[in-house]
Amino acid sequence: RDIKQFQSRRFMGSYTDLMRDPTVRPATQFFLDELYSPGDYSARDAQFARIAGTLQTVFPRPVVHTALTLALLHAKTEELDHAMAQAWLAQPETTPEAGRYAVAWKTAGQPEARRQQLAWVMELGHDLTRFTRTPGLRLLLRTMRRPAQAAGMGALQHFLEMGFDTFGALTKKRGAVEGFLDTVRERETRLMDLLFDAELVACETQLARTLGQAR
């Protein structure tokens, strides 16, 4: 739980400028709520795993692919968070949280998994953008509410509708989606490179600065 809360605050600190920009604030908030939130998504992930084989009976194929990508992302995130939590708890409670997180990150390692995690985040953003440009898909999503609820896929339905509306609004401004996704990719990649390659004191200093911006 501490790891998730730290990561949520870190995301807010990394994107305070985007949260102040009315054009991209909804998309930034959507990423925070759905992908970087400290909330427990185990029920939604279990739902996806349980009904993965029946998704195609309710949703169009492109949507099925996105749902499975989301499930893979959250499963990998849980795995990495668990590894970091073990390393976090192994440290004295008096350790400053920024330094504690940096040590946990370096201890957990798995750079390839981290890169894949970010690649899935980007893929979801591009998928949702593509959906908004598919004629009739928004209406189709709306008509699928009851079937989705009946099939136990209400959480997925919510994610898709929220994502569709959020990115649909963003596509109305030329280049806004691409700019938003590029910014997230660049900042998250820069942070990963820092945490994997830099000395501990540099990692702790940057993380503490970022957390300060979230306040």
Which sequence ranges carry the predicted segments?
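Extended, well-ordered protein cores
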Residues: R1-A214
